[in-house]
């Protein structure tokens, strides 16, 4: 009997020992398969993105010729529809929601830094999880006070729409349209919640530099750097809640928000997805959505027959 028990122990130990190498090989094979699939996905995305990236690069190269730049930007301004002049309570003219994008003559657009930034933005847009009509990603954000981790949907309250405004201080269109965004906050905050999410710098002083940027801020190396930059923005947007994207840029990646972008979330669903900045960043589109929502909410109810 003792001999049989010893033999059984040897047989059991031998089986476990033989399964060890097989289990390790299976784990290695599974890991190799995942890496291969990830590589195939990256390769496929590069093939899909490259034509668009090449077109953008050619456009930036052409815009470095001042005669072409002035002609194209001037034609774009002339092609924009004239908006009705709006007056404030003091009778002064209110600036337009989307002032034209200005590019100074001394700014080069086609550089290695600019191409890297364009590729980064297009890749984030391609892989984003957020799509109009779909579920809103509940990505992580950080409070500037205390560095407490929260999630975007923590700021959604019941059935109230939540407006997300992604951007940074070194992005000229984002800063130029901040006053228009603030007017919307003041007008609709009774029924709508607003949240600014400070993301990585669009034009850092150690990256794609532009003299049109109102501030000179380097790339964020830590959350402390991002907080310091966000404080500058917070001074100009005191009525709106502000949070930071994580240093892994989880929210910017989930929403494809680089360089800047606008979203509206309601009941966990993306109701409005603005275009990717700079060209697609249109506060006037957000205003139109809010006006329609306000009309549905407070407009006359149809009479029952």
Swiss-Prot record:
Subcellular locations according to the entry: Cell membrane; Endosome membrane
Major location (coarse): membrane
Keyword Cytoplasm (UniProt): no
Cytoplasmic side: 1-43
Signal peptide span: none
Amino acid composition bias (Acidic residues), ranges on this chain: 82-96
Pfam families, per the entry: T4_deiodinase
GO molecular function: thyroxine 5'-deiodinase activity; thyroxine 5-deiodinase activity
Protein's name according to its UniProt entry: Thyroxine 5-deiodinase
Species annotation: Sus scrofa (Pig)
Lineage of the organism: Eukaryota, Metazoa, Chordata, Craniata, Vertebrata
Gene behind this protein: DIO3
